[in-house]
Amino acid sequence: MEQWRQCGRWLIDCKVLPPNHRVVWPSAVVFDLAQALRDGVLLCQLLHNLSPGSIDLKDINFRPQMSQFLCLKNIRTFLKVCHDKFGLRNSELFDPFDLFDVRDFGKVISAVSRLSLHSIAQNKGIRPFPSEETTENDDDVYRSLEELADEHDLGEDIYDCVPCEDGGDDIYEDIIKVEVQQPMIRYMQKMGMTEDDKRNCCLLEIQETEAKYYRTLEDIEKNYMSPLRLVLSPADMAAVFINLEDLIKVHHSFLRAIDVSVMVGGSTLAKVFLDFKERLLIYGEYCSHMEHAQNTLNQLLASREDFRQKVEECTLKVQDGKFKLQDLLVVPMQRVLKYHLLLKELLSHSAERPERQQLKEALEAMQDLAMYINEVKRDKETLRKISEFQSSIENLQVKLEEFGRPKIDGELKVRSIVNHTKQDRYLFLFDKVVIVCKRKGYSYELKEIIELLFHKMTDDPMNNKDVKKSHGKMWSYGFYLIHLQGKQGFQFFCKTEDMKRKWMEQFEMAMSNIKPDKANANHHSFQMYTFDKTTNCKACKMFLRGTFYQGYMCTKCGVGAHKECLEVIPPCKFTSPADLDASGAGPGPKMVAMQNYHGNPAPPGKPVLTFQTGDVLELLRGDPESPWWEGRLVQTRKSGYFPSSSVKPCPVDGRPPISRPPSREIDYTAYPWFAGNMERQQTDNLLKSHASGTYLIRERPAEAERFAISIKFNDEVKHIKVVEKDNWIHITEAKKFDSLLELVEYYQCHSLKESFKQLDTTLKYPYKSRERSASRASSRSPASCASYNFSFLSPQGLSFASQGPSAPFWSVFTPRVIGTAVARYNFAARDMRELSLREGDVVRIYSRIGGDQGWWKGETNGRIGWFPSTYVEEEGIQ
């Protein structure tokens, strides 16, 4: 038997792969095993299974999706533990790219074989490999795997469940249904049951399971929380039990309301669920912190004998020790995701009931709640990934979460339109920007932040050719990112045509998120937005889900909406003059731009109108005392708000002036960094009480150079002269700008050490808005730990990655139709893995794996992807 097949069987014996994984199929090829291991998740699981506690689960990215960064981090984590904990030498291991790019899969097999021969593995009683002579020619077996890797995605689906979720359901059934199963079975076995009988049966199940659930919560509080307060710090208590006390209070009231409703026939039960929808939102916090709770609990059990003994003592008091604390903490998440299923069953037996319509509304409310909770969990995981990106990029002075959700990352070659040199770069694509970096070992040096709002993407068909050199393929598949106002653009080159297609698709999706087609429907001006409080969509009334950039907000009237609902939102109540042109409103006076304006600073709560020096605008609205005016570009007809100080009246003939106005003619008083006339000593006194990175631009009227930058850095205030010469402005000859504004915007993102080696800081905090910036930062701090699905580890600590016999999540399989459904609502995909729906679309369902997380996989209109299961109605199911 080939060595790679023996490796696959050994991984099955270690409970890393399921028994019927494709690697044991007669048709299997070595790439099937390579594909299963490429993201590093299963290798990390292997170490955990061999030696629980040897690997810190917080270091594993269980769903790396399309991220090369996260896959390589997993592989490096595996290699480090192999070296540090299992004693393997570096020469016995492999380079991360040997696996990720499948450059040398033979080395990977060899390293896994050495693990199988380790005493830790031997003590498990698992037969090592190779256990027999192999006759394969390694070079032949592993040849061309790197090309296959270029052509195939890692086969992980972000919405797939993990196998232990079934185990979680088993625990839930044991704990919650243990008392009602037999009565229910006897009830259902009666002959001639009417619909009312079945309805009463459903009511009984809702009532009794809720009562049992509430008793379970009380058991946790009485038998675990109270005793453990004596041995745990408040911080550890909060980490393990999260907001369980709040859940208990809510369910005390919820159970009483259910009891009252069922006692009078259940006709008001729908209203009970509708009334409690908002209060049940606290499950978002509970579910999203479950991973951290489980990890904290496991670490405390492993490190503190007094705590372990106390927990064992507490366990014996709860149902005779049948369930561990780890089991019980799972139950709340399972329970809240069951409510819509219970109501769906009740609705199916309430066809003739007068409260049927309200039951439908209650069902939709609980489906919406389940989706909200799942999206909060998903966003917590996303924020954790963003945090890892953040910590790995040097010179990055902005919070990556401000740029939306990550789409894809990886290595491309980049060439700017100005600089024609093709350079190796690592790209992180987000909804709003693409971060261009240079790789430095395991970290990255920031080179450029490209804002997608000001760019468009075009194909480069001239470079679509497969050119090979003696040492491999050239990166010859290209596309462009072109600046909308004619500034510097970029050309990107991919290794394969398939890689180019994926990158272009992700760019298109990101751009559609930040600039939706219907953003200005019905005179609104919608922008992607993070809502501080739970908000309902103005159109469909359902939650805007998640924890950041949950949807879109109109900058005029402030209403929120899903992406798919933008076109059906009622007309904006604050219609601007630009929207009334059709009704005969004439254009205002023409103005000419005295400087470039790229949206920084941004008008508070208003859409931005960007322009360049010399552009002509029509003034639509402008109070002489206001720092912000509304206008419209004559050439493009785009409208929005801009600093009133950046324009001046156009000459009578309507033509803009030829030359760029000098900085002395521009009024910068509207900007939070401009201090006006200020002496050096006065500046020192002003800035010394501020945080490092706080800066201002001041005028030096008595000096040859009019402006100076003053910035606090490492407890000192530094001063930099701004030179104006030959119609350019700069602080170093190497980097020149059109205006002071452009110079400031550049050094807000790029370190001053480019010009002054000892000054490694950007222009962080404008001195006028320092307090406001600090307030915003504190209200938007990223989560310290985001949630992957905690059920990767079952309560017994068994395998957390096998997907089950039908369809492992890492495998590539031919879709099989298992049902059809009709879309009840519109749904706009935010990601290339998602499937957009229009109301009435017929969807062929390929997989319900992921249903507990709210997502199914299917096909409609020629596209395959994941969609919210609550947005469709299965045909044949009432």
Curated annotation (Swiss-Prot):
Tissue/organ expression? Widely expressed.
Task: Provide the Calponin-homology (CH) domain boundaries.
Answer: 1-120
- SMART domains recorded for this chain? C1, CH, PH, RhoGEF, SH2, SH3
Q: Domain PH, which positions?
A: 405-512
Q: Which InterPro entries match?
A: CAMSAP-like_CH_dom, CH_dom, CH_dom_sf, DBL_dom_sf, DH_dom, GDS_CDC24_CS, PE/DAG-bd, PH-like_dom_sf
Which controlled-vocabulary keywords does the entry list? Angiogenesis, Guanine-nucleotide releasing factor, Metal-binding, Phosphoprotein, Repeat, SH2 domain, SH3 domain, Zinc, Zinc-finger
Q: Where are the zinc fingers (Phorbol-ester/DAG-type)?
A: 523-572
Where would I find the SH3 domain in this sequence? 586-652, 816-877
- Start and end residues of each DH domain: 198-376
Specify the superkingdom: Eukaryota
Entry annotated with the keyword Repeat = yes
Q: Name its GO BP terms in alphabetical order.
A: angiogenesis; cell migration; cellular response to xenobiotic stimulus; Fc-epsilon receptor signaling pathway; Fc-gamma receptor signaling pathway involved in phagocytosis; immune response-regulating cell surface receptor signaling pathway; lamellipodium assembly; platelet activation
Name positions with the PTM Phosphotyrosine.
Y142, Y159, Y172
| Family annotation (PROSITE patterns) | CH (PS50021), DH_1 (PS00741), DH_2 (PS50010), PH_DOMAIN (PS50003), SH2 (PS50001), SH3 (PS50002), ZF_DAG_PE_1 (PS00479), ZF_DAG_PE_2 (PS50081)
Q: Give a short account of its post-translational modification.
A: Phosphorylated on tyrosine residues in response to FGR activation.
In the record, Phosphoserine modifications are located at S576, S583, S626
- SH2 domain location: 673-767
For this chain, one GO molecular function annotation is:
phosphotyrosine residue binding
One GO term describing the cellular component: cytoplasm
Q: What does this protein do?
A: Guanine nucleotide exchange factor for the Rho family of Ras-related GTPases. Plays an important role in angiogenesis. Its recruitment by phosphorylated EPHA2 is critical for EFNA1-induced RAC1 GTPase activation and vascular endothelial cell migration and assembly.
- Assembly description: Interacts (via SH2 domains) with the phosphorylated form of EPHA2. Interacts with SSX2IP. Interacts with NEK3 and PRLR and this interaction is prolactin-dependent.
Write the protein's name: Guanine nucleotide exchange factor VAV2
This protein's species is Homo sapiens
Organism placement in taxonomy: Eukaryota, Metazoa, Chordata, Craniata, Vertebrata
* Name of the gene: VAV2
